[in-house]
């Protein structure tokens, strides 16, 4: 029983050490990545503006801008009304 408790304690200690070392390694990698990419902040600003453009409402297609051709212009095959 004492041997299994020691093994469990050793495994727990190894897990704690591994999690601490991986956390420190990830923080170091994050700092290096940030230092290598100073333009990242500008890129995120353009991404934000692109998201705003996507969120804009589109024109309601039930109300067309142009009407069908009423033959008001010389080009009768245009299909659109040039008055509107």
Swiss-Prot record:
Can the keyword Transmembrane be found in this entry's annotation? no
Where are the bilayer-spanning segments?
Answer: none
Per the UniProt entry, what is one GO biological process?
A: iron ion transmembrane transport
Q: Which domain of life is it from?
A: Eukaryota
Q: Can you say where in the cell this protein is located?
A: Secreted
Q: Does the keyword Oxidoreductase apply?
A: no
Q: Which UniProt keywords apply?
A: Antibiotic, Antimicrobial, Cleavage on pair of basic residues, Disulfide bond, Hormone, Secreted, Signal
Q: Which Pfam families does the UniProt entry name for this protein?
A: Hepcidin (PF06446)
Predominant localisation class: secreted
An example of a Gene Ontology cellular component annotation for this protein is: nucleus
Signal sequence coordinates: 1-23
Disulfide pattern: 66-82, 69-72, 70-78, 73-81
List the propeptide region positions: 24-54
Q: Name one GO molecular function term.
A: hormone activity
Identify its protein family: Belongs to the hepcidin family.
Q: How does it assemble?
A: Interacts with SLC40A1; this interaction promotes SLC40A1 rapid ubiquitination.
Give the protein's function.
Liver-produced hormone that constitutes the main circulating regulator of iron absorption and distribution across tissues. Acts by promoting endocytosis and degradation of ferroportin/SLC40A1, leading to the retention of iron in iron-exporting cells and decreased flow of iron into plasma. Controls the major flows of iron into plasma: absorption of dietary iron in the intestine, recycling of iron by macrophages, which phagocytose old erythrocytes and other cells, and mobilization of stored iron from hepatocytes. Has strong antimicrobial activity against E.coli ML35P N.cinerea and weaker against S.epidermidis, S.aureus and group b streptococcus bacteria. Active against the fungus C.albicans. No activity against P.aeruginosa.
Would you tell me the protein name for this molecule? Hepcidin
Q: Which organism is it from?
A: Rattus norvegicus
- Classification of source organism: Eukaryota, Metazoa, Chordata, Craniata, Vertebrata
